[in-house]
Amino acid sequence: MKIRRAAAVAFMTAVLIIQQIFPAQAAEVQELYALSAVLMDGESGRVLYGKEAYKARPNASTTKVMTCILALELGNGDDYVQVSKEAASQPQTHLGMKEGQQFYLEDLLYSLMLKSHNDTAVAIAEHIGGSVKKFAALMNQKAKELGCTDTHFVTPNGLDGEDEGGIHHTTARDLALIMAYAVKNSTFVHITQTRDYTFSDISGKKYYTVHNTNAFLDMETGVITGKTGFTGNAGYCYVCAARQDEKLFIVALLGCGWPGNKNYKWSDARKLLSYGRNNYRYAVLPEIPRLPEIPVSDAVPDNRERGSGTGTLLKLHAAVSEKALAKRYLLKKTETITWETELPGKLEAPVRKNQRIGSLHAKLDGKEIFSCPVTAEDKISRITYKWYVDKVFQDYFH
C-alpha cells in the first residue's frame, strides 16, 4: 500500500509539473447576452474579442462618455452653466433643474456621469457648443479623430435622435475606442470613480446628491471607470475600463438585455475580462530586422569598394522611435509579431541622404500594427561625363 500511495503521489506531482510547463489553453469566451460586444486592449486599441463588433446600434447613455470628455477638454470646471428651457424639459432620468438656474460645470459633470441625468447633458452641450446641434458636430469630429468608423452622434445624452447625417448610433468597437481615450484623462477617471457627490446651484438655495449607478466598480476587482446606459430601443448598454494583472482592458456591450435582465451586462463584462486575463500577455515589437543593401546603378563607387564598375550598394535605415519600441501589445500565447519590408530590388542614382526608399511593417495576426519609412543612410551621386574624365586622368596621369 505504501508503494502504491508513493506511486500515486509521484504521478500527481508529475501531472502538476506538466501542467505548469504546458498550461492548458484557456477556454474561449462563453456565450454572451449582448447583441454586440468588444474586449479591447486599452493600450494599443486592438480588438481582442468581438461579437458583431462593427454593427451599428443605439448606445443610450454610454454617449455621455464623449459628452464628458469634450466638456473637460473645451470647458473649465468653474464655468457658470445656465439652464435653458430645452435642457429643463428633458425626460427622466433627470436632475430636475429649472430654466434660468445656474450651476458650476464641474458639478454638472458628476450629475452627468454618476446619475446619468439627461437635462444635465443638454445644459453642458449648450454651454460648450452653443447649441445641441453644434455640440453634436464637435462629438462627431472627435469620434473621427479617435478613429471611429461608424459612429454618429445626434444627442449629448444618448436619447434617440436623427438628423441629416442619420440616426444616433455607434458600434461596440467605436465605443471601446472612445473609452480607451477617456480613461487616459485623470479627471474623467476621478469623476467616474466617485461613489456619491453633493452640490448646489450657484445661488446655494438648492442642494442635490447623486449616487454612482456603475455598480461594477465594487463588483469586479480592477475596474477603473465605466458608464451604464438604457433606452427601450438600445437595451442595456455598458462600457468600462479595467486594469487586471497589469493589463488594461476595455469592455463595450450594446443591446445587453431589456427590463428584467438588468444584470446581464455585469455577467458579460466578467466573462470578457476573464477571457482577457487568461488568454493574453503583453509583448513589445521584436528586434528590428537587418535591412538589405540595395544595388544602385549608374552610381559613383564608394571608397570602401562595396560596389564595382558603375554601381554601388545603398545602406538603409528604419526610423523606429523609442516610443514605438516601448509600446505594448496584448498577445495570445500562440501569437507573434512579425516584420515585413517593402523595398525595391534596385535603384538608379542619384539617391539623396534620408530619401524614402520603402517601408517597414510590423504585423500581428495578419494585420498591420506599426509601420515606418525606410530611408537612405547616405547619399549616392550619379556618374557624369566629368566623373569619367577625372577618373581617366587619375588612373593614367597619377
Ranges and model annotations:
Residues 2-25:
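Sec-dependent N-terminal signal peptides of Gram-positive bacterial secreted proteins and lipoproteins
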